[in-house]
C-alpha cells in the first residue's frame, strides 16, 4: 500500500499537513509552473525531458531557474521510498513558484524568493485518446 507524500522547504509530510504561505504568488496569481512526472516501477519516466521543459518554462516566464537534476534526484528518490511506491504507478508533481511577496499587486518581486515543493501519490495513468470539442468563431 502506498502513502501520498509531500516536501516543502526541507520538511516531509502529507499535502494536508505541510504549509504553503497564503501570500505565495502561485496561489494568489498562478505565478508559477509545474511538471507532472509518471513514476512507474519506482522510476521517474522521461525525467530529463520534463526537467528540460520545466527549466525552459521558467526562463520563458522570467523566473529564476528551478532546482536541477542533481538537487532533485535525492528528493525524488526519497519521495518514492517514503510513499512506498514499489509496483504502483505514481504522479510526481514538481512545483516552482515565484514565491511570496510582501506587497499586493501583480508587480514582480525581487529575484531570489522562489519556492519549490513536490507531491507524490499513487495514480492510475490514462493512456487512451481524449477527444476535445472546440468552437470556431
Show the residue positions of the predicted features.
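Conserved alpha/beta cores of soluble small-molecule-handling proteins
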Residues: 1-137
